């Protein structure tokens, strides 16, 4: 395996690998989500308190997808997941222990499994990998994200 592996179309199996490999923390970044996030967190061997989600809520989505997203977020919070909000987030990533990730265009939804998407599997420790800056940026976004979407700047 190389440090960056392209994944055309559906990244689900790679997301699952990353979720199952988590040893200390698993974080998902996604502006759009559904029960897929719950499923991936359930497949992770860690407790709910070691799981995190970063999403955006800076525009009101009154569609069924937006309603589903709110239901899933409320369930995650009840389960003990650390849910944070980052205005204008558009990145899609699942990150295990800040050293393995899948980053790409695919939202964490069941619908996106049938879309034309491209993602990349990243491994910080593969020979020749120079991905420290990438994982540092994701970690900075995690730290930057707030816990209350009501406080977000809506500019």
Sequence positions of predicted segments:
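Short Gly/Ser/Thr- and Asp/Glu-enriched loop/turn motifs at secondary-structure junctions
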Residues: 88-90
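General small-molecule cofactor/ligand-binding pocket signal
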Residues: 81-86
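Short beta-strand scaffold segments in enzyme catalytic cores
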Residues: 92-95, 120-121
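Signature of lipid phosphatidyltransferase scaffolds
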Residues: 3-8, 102-155
């Amino acid at each position: 395996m190389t440090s960056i592996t392209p994944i055309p179309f559906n990244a689900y199996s790679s997301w699952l690998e990353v979720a199952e490999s988590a040893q200390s923390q698993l974080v998902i970044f996604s502006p759009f989500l559904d029960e897929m996030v719950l499923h991936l967190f359930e497949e992770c061997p860690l407790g709910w308190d070691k799981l995190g989600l970063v999403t955006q809520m800076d525009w009101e989505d009154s569609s069924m997808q937006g309603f589903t997203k709110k239901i899933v977020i409320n369930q995650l919070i009840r389960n003990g997941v650390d849910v944070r909000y980052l205005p204008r987030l558009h990145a899609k990533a699942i990150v295990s222990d800040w050293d393995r990730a899948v980053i790409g265009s695919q939202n964490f939804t069941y619908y996106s499994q049938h879309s034309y998407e491209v993602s990349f599997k990243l491994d910080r420790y593969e020979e020749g990998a120079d991905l420290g800056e990438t994982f540092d940026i994701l970690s900075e976004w995690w730290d930057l994200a707030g816990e209350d979407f009501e406080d977000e700047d809506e500019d």
